[in-house]
C-alpha cells in the first residue's frame, strides 16, 4: 500500500517536467516544419501547443506566422494580438501584426503596430517606411511626407522611400508596396527556457492597450 502511494506521488512529480518536455518537442517540430514550408502542419502543431499552454506567446506568434504564409491574414492578426497580450516587448510580433493589418487594409491598426515596433527598434528602416506608407493610406499626407523626409535623411539610398515620397507629393496611389523585413529572425525569440533571462528592451512610450482591434 505504502509503495503504491510512493509510486503515485513520484508520477505526479514527473508529470510537469514530462509535459514541458513534450511542449518543447512540439515547438521544435513546429519550427522545423515552418522553416521547411509546411505551413498547414506547423499551424496545426502550434495550435496544439497553445491549447496545452495558452500563455506561451512564442507559439501564438509562430502560429500567426504560419497563417500569414497561408494568407489567413485575419487569423494571423488575431494570433498576433494574443502573443502581444502575453509579450508586448518584441518588435517582430508588432511587425507581423502590422503587415497582416496592411493585407486586411486596416491601415490605422498597422500605424499603431509599427509605432510600437519603432519604439523597440529605431534602426529598422522597413518599420519607418511601412508606417509612412500606412499614414498615407489613411489620408495623413503631411505626416507621411514628414516621415519620409526623416527616412531619407537617415537612409539616402532607400529607393522605395524615394518612390513613395514622389507618389505622396503627386497625390497618387503608391507604386511601392509595404516592405517585409528580409529574413525575419523568428528563431531569435526568447525560448521556453529563457523566460527569466535576457528580457527584451522595454518600449518607451506606447503600451499594448493602444492597439485597435
Language-model segments: which ranges?
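Conserved structural position within tetratricopeptide repeats
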Residues: 35, 47-51, 81-85, 115-119, ...
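Helix-start (N-cap) detector for alpha-helical repeat units in TPR-like alpha-solenoids
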Residues: 22-24, 57-58, 91-92, 125-126, ...
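Register position in tetratricopeptide repeats
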Residues: 35-36, 69-70, 103-104, 137-138, ...
Amino acid at each position: 500500500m505504502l509503495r503504491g502511494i510512493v509510486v503515485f506521488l513520484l508520477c505526479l512529480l514527473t508529470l510537469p517536467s514530462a509535459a514541458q518536455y513534450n511542449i518543447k518537442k512540439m515547438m521544435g517540430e513546429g519550427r522545423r516544419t515552418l522553416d521547411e514550408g509546411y505551413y498547414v502542419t506547423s499551424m496545426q502543431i502550434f495550435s496544439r501547443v497553445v491549447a496545452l499552454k495558452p500563455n506561451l506567446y512564442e507559439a501564438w506568434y509562430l502560429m500567426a506566422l504560419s497563417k500569414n504564409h497561408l494568407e489567413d491574414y485575419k487569423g494571423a492578426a488575431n494570433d498576433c494580438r494574443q502573443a502581444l497580450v502575453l509579450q508586448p516587448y518584441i518588435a517582430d510580433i508588432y511587425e507581423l501584426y502590422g503587415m497582416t493589418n496592411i493585407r486586411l487594409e486596416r491601415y490605422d491598426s498597422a500605424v499603431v503596430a509599427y509605432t510600437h515596433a519603432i519604439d523597440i527598434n529605431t534602426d529598422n528602416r522597413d518599420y519607418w517606411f511601412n508606417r509612412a506608407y500606412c499614414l498615407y493610406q489613411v489620408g495623413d499626407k503631411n505626416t507621411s511626407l514628414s516621415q519620409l523626409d526623416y527616412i531619407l535623411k537617415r537612409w539616402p539610398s532607400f529607393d522605395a522611400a524615394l518612390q513613395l515620397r514622389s507618389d505622396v507629393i503627386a497625390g497618387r496611389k503608391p507604386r511601392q508596396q509595404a516592405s517585409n523585413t528580409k529574413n525575419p529572425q523568428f528563431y531569435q525569440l526568447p525560448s521556453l527556457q529563457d523566460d527569466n533571462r535576457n528580457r527584451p528592451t522595454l518600449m518607451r512610450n506606447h503600451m499594448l492597450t493602444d492597439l485597435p482591434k
